[in-house]
């Protein structure tokens, strides 16, 4: 709820990107290696989204290309990028042989007819198929703080932390003529401070989620009854869904109860 997805999508508008210059992918557990790199669908050998954009960017070195991955922590980036992950921070250079790699399907492509081999390869060298990631292809991801990616993936990126914007939250509530907007924001701050300082396992809440409090107003104010309803219907389900599988139900329930006690005027 900190606006990560909105910021990612806004890049398309800000850069005035043509459809051919970007791919926007929202990950889920069903994504596989063949969806990003390549593989067989039935009897057809198909390029994945990332490989296809690598080829387009390589053939247009003066253009800018963007691969936008939303909800990156929903799937294993190591599995879906495969060998290509090592090239995220070693982009293609004609003088650098290590900027080319053989993927798990390169030997399959080598056996194709010449025309099909060229079509299925990012690059051909000495008649063999190679993968490369061009320098004019930018990869941007969003992921939740409580989820992790492997160090091998993490080191390829510059990380930008997105936090709850309490100013934006207060402006949003005031625009909806909620007269106790400042007091409501103070409660939200207290909850996130409690989560950061006192508990393990609960995730911090972003302003995008807290903006939902506007639906719980009564007579131009948000009363304690509204806070209670918001906590039960919005926050508690988020806490439970975001909790790791190692959490014991009892201890999680205790932490949620403690958080609820903080979410008060």
Task: Describe each PLM feature range.
Residues 1-265:
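C-terminal regulatory/interaction module of P-loop NTP-utilizing enzymes
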């Amino acid at each position: 709820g900190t606006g990560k997805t909105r910021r990612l999508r806004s890049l398309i508008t800000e850069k005035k990107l043509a459809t051919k210059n970007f791919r926007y992918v929202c990950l889920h557990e069903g994504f596989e290696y063949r969806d990003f790199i390549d593989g067989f669908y039935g009897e057809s050998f198909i390029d994945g989204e990332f490989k296809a954009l690598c080829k387009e960017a390589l053939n247009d070195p003066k253009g800018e290309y963007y691969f936008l991955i939303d909800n990156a922590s929903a799937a294993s980036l190591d599995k879906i990028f495969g060998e290509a992950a090592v090239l995220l921070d070693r982009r293609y250079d004609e003088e650098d042989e290590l900027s080319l790699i053989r993927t798990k399907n390169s030997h399959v492509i080598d056996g194709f007819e010449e025309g099909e081999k060229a079509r299925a390869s990012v690059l051909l060298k000495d008649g063999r198929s190679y993968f490369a990631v061009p320098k004019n292809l930018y990869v941007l991801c969003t992921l939740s703080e409580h989820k992790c990616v492997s160090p091998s993936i993490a080191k390829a990126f510059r990380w930008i932390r997105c936090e709850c914007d309490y100013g934006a939250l207060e402006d949003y509530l005031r625009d909806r003529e909620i007269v106790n907007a400042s007091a409501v924001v103070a409660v939200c701050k207290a909850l996130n401070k409690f989560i950061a300082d006192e508990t393990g396992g609960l995730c911090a809440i972003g302003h995008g989620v807290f903006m939902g409090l506007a639906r719980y107003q009564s007579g131009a104010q948000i009363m304690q009854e509204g806070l209670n309803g918001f906590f039960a219907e919005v926050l508690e389900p988020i806490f439970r869904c975001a909790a790791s599988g190692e959490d014991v139900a009892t201890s999680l329930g205790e932490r949620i109860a403690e958080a609820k006690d903080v979410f008060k005027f």
